[in-house]
Amino acid sequence: ELAEQFGRSLAKTHSVTPASFGAEQDGFIGLAPLPNRPLPTWEEFYASRRVMPYLRAAVDRGALTVEQAAIIERAMKQIHSFSGDSEPPALLHGDLWSGNMVWGAEQIHLIDPAVHGGHRETDLAMLALFGTPHLQKVLDAYNETSPLQDGWTERVALHQLHPLLVHAVLFGGAYGARAVAAAQSLFDHATSE
């Protein structure tokens, strides 16, 4: 089945280890600029290149209040508490949602990448965000090929902060509230352990 084949292929793509977290050139995600300058750890890269620029823009555009933004900012200050064990950079698609997957007769083709070195859970969290068909089959095949760290499903919300904030900036609506809920869920999960 295509979903299993895709899960295995994605795991193999993620096994490619770029030199750093980030990329040498900045890019775009949709119409939004995407800062990519490399940083030594995923946590630094994700907080400063993915979440914080869009958090500021979401507040400036009225998609989040200052109080809501403070919850996400607090999560970024505590990102090491939520991020799991460190992993080497993985080669990511970077904008891997179902709309960038073209299901062919024999394989799934990916379009519109925002390629960079990142955390492999980021691509998987993006797949979960907007309803990828046969997602569980994709994830099972991925995990068989390249086992994920324990607790990765609890970190999905962390990895979804960036795309939710990008959508809050570009489209407004409920995306800002969803980003706040994702950040709050990190704190809720941490206190329930």
Segments (PLM) and residue ranges:
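An acidic site on a long C-lobe helix of protein kinase domains
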Residues: 2, 157-160
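Active-site Asp-x-Gly
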Residues: 42-47, 56, 88-91, 98-157, ...
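A mid-sequence, solvent-exposed acidic-amphipathic segment
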Residues: 65-106
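A general structural signal marking secondary-structure boundaries and capping sites
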Residues: 14-21, 58, 83, 146, ...
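Active-site catalytic-loop/activation-segment of kinase and kinase-like phosphoryl-transfer enzymes
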Residues: 29-80
